[in-house]
């Protein structure tokens, strides 16, 4: 099988299939990638370990920090305790939440930010922040903010401040008065 055909089938499998975890599999969140196709993950209970990426996903599917995975446990592993079985995208996450298979440790607030529940007092750790963020977002929507726009990094960006432009206008008006 050629590389292009393999890539096509792997991508189709990951994006198209809706997989439910078996009793041995776990849903984990990616914390980072130390390298060599290993990913540091955290369970909903807070346990951290490394998960290896199988060869069928390597150079075909990319995993970034904050993504969710379904992993198969490896019994003989000391540091690497799991192997990635499936990558969960937003559609997969919504489906698992509707079916009640989503771990209670990972919750989503209205803004779509995934947070970890605070186990000490049983409330979300970002509950107070989410209401403050909602108020700020309401205020931000009233003003025009270009921070979300695409920035072309191939061009030199000159930043003019209002103070500089005012001082330039003053110096120009002084020069005009002298002439």
From Swiss-Prot:
Residues 14-89 form the S1-like domain. Residues 160-179 have a biased composition (Acidic residues). The keyword Nucleus applies. CDD domains: S1_eIF1AD_like. Pfam families: eIF-1a (PF01176). Residues 120-134 have a biased composition (Polar residues). PROSITE patterns: S1_IF1_TYPE. The keyword RNA-binding applies. One of its GO terms (cellular component) is nucleus. It comes from the Eukaryota. It is found in: Nucleus. Keywords: Nucleus, RNA-binding. Belongs to the EIF1AD family. This is Probable RNA-binding protein EIF1AD.
